[in-house]
Amino acid sequence: MTRPFSRGRGGGSALLALFLALAAVLFGSAPVPAAAGGAWWDATSRPAPDSQINVTGAPFTGTDAQGKVRGFVDAHNHLMSNEGFGGRMICGSTFSAAGVADALKDCPEHYPDGSGALFEHLTGGDNGKHDPVGWPTFKDWPANNSLSHQQNYYAWVERAWRGGQRVLVNDLVTNGLICSLLPRDRSCDEMTAIRLEARKTYELQDYVDGMYGGPGKGWFRIVTSADQARSVIQQGKLAVVLGVETSEPFGCKQILDVAQCSQADIDKGLDELYGLGVRSMFLCHKFDNALCGVRFDSGTTGVAVNIGQFLSTGTFWSTEKCAGPQHDNPIGLAAAPAAMAEKLPPGVSVPSYASDAKCNTRGLTRLGEYALKGMVQRGMMLELDHMSVKAAGRALDMLEAEEYPGVLSSHSWMDLDWTERLYRLGGFAASYMHSAEGFVGEAAQKAELRKKYGVGFGYGTDMNGVGGWPGPVGPDAPNAVKYPFRSFDGGSVIDRQVTGQRTWDLNTDGAAHNGLVPDWIEQIRLTSGGQSVVDELSHGAESYLTTWKRTEDHEPGVNLAAGRPASASTTQWWNPFVNFSPALTVDGDTGTRWASEWSDDQWLQVDLGSVRRVGRVTLDWERAYARAYRIELSENGTTWRSVWSTDAGDGGYDTATFDSQSARYVRVHGVKRATDWGYSLYEVAVNRS
């Protein structure tokens, strides 16, 4: 919070105050020292002029009586998206060494009247014009429905922290195709943008530290481990986690269904991201890529994104009937936005889709599986949001096979039917920043599951993420915020937020920027059923850190079958140029496979070398999978007992778990095929439990 300079009544202090005022006028921002002996949360040298924080009281520190940290989690934010998309999609900066007036200014093409703001027009943020002036008047932006203007000015992030937020996931984000369609001042290469956004996040940490007396002293702390995050939160500061949400990670786009990256590119890319401090990421976003298919957007947005997919990859989305209760978003038949439709080649139009075909045909590719395994090896957390249900289901199968807890859903883009599988693994979930009523309603849908698994809850603001935010409810609404109000812990008083000449009120302005998150949480509390939701949100930080710590501590189970002798009832032999030996199921290479002859009663078995304890068998099926099969064990290779069976096999990854038993031989016994082919397995893994 900005505080006036004061050091007694002497003429020297008055002269210094006059000098600082003149410096602010003539040279822009000048630091304003805090009073001697000020509280740790007050900056010792804040720029002036600057935004106010409008929160008084000490940020809570330490832990609760059970030794757990408290605080909210913003599981999905984009602090630096103004640096992505070619640098001109999101106008205004999170910070500037030249001060607030330089940070909170519009893009050059928006002047003088907003008529050149192409992206703002496309997304409905204005009626063809807007006042481009940010600081100090902010007549038209930021606003809850303006998708092209900065919402994450550092002081607004500071206000969210002062209101009780203790974890912020900063997803580094961009999209090369969108960049190519908009005004830009830099490269559209996605990895170049990701590197820049990471660097700018570290520069923001340095910028905040400079206000507090030097390195490590500010409230904005980038963390790379769960233990670091816990220490930061116990100090009462904000733990900032780096994530990645981009359409072509490591250059892994697909063109006409041909991957444009290799396993080597993935290894190099994951190593680089980990070195930058990234600990969570999406494998695909908006466009189908070489790693996975996406969950569709709906309505007009869906049509526009589908056109973007075609322009980027040469393919439109392809749909099929869903295999289970989970489904992707319906694409719909909305008219294509003219500005996008005119980009299509002559004679090409957006295809129509059957109303009962709601699932993306594309799932998790072999390269996607390789990338996911690479994330597991590096202790990184996977974001399921934006994955098609086919891809998400396959990813969950793989994570369950590894008993890997590092799985997240950060902003309501995962089918809710996956929630229990996520919690069973030990993952963390958050909902998008809907209206207070919408957020409470969505939270209620899985409240019993959170109670069952003893987990907290989070929100994903998606600020600067082109999503739209809660609008005004009016001062007379039943859940209208009464200013000033107290933070959830009772330790701070929060008043209307003031930046320059503009005062924001959530009731009349909606959630225009990140600084209004505490106000939105207060509105949730005032909504019917909202107090219990706020209570769950206050446990979000602990739950997020628990997921992260378990991810770091995960130890892969020993595959008892790796490299052991394998045999089979039959092997497909009639193609002399391809090897389908049963030994290929235990070679650790998902690019090779065993294939049987084309009949039902077939088996594959592995000799573990000696009697071992066995409690889990994982199968990676090729398209020729078993509808019905059983897992059998034996000590001598002649006398077998069935320990697990199914008659509803659906291919992909299968994990059979059963009470741990002694066995030397493990057999997969096919009873009924799901296809006209035989049975085919890429890999078989056997574990103790």
Annotated model-derived regions:
Residues 629-631:
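Short beta-strand elements bearing conserved aromatic residues within extracellular beta-rich modules
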Residues 641-659:
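Extracellular carbohydrate recognition and processing domains
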Residues 669-676:
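Short beta-strand-plus-loop segments that form exposed binding edges in beta-rich domains
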Residues 26, 557-609, 620-625, 645-648, ...:
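Disordered, acidic Ser/Thr/Pro-rich linker "stalks" and the adjacent N-terminal cap
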Residues 2-35:
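Secretory targeting and sorting signals
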Residues 612-623, 668:
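A short beta-strand element within beta-rich, extracytoplasmic domains
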Residues 35-361, 366-373, 392-400, 407, ...:
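N-terminal hydrophobic targeting/anchoring segments and the immediately downstream early-domain regions
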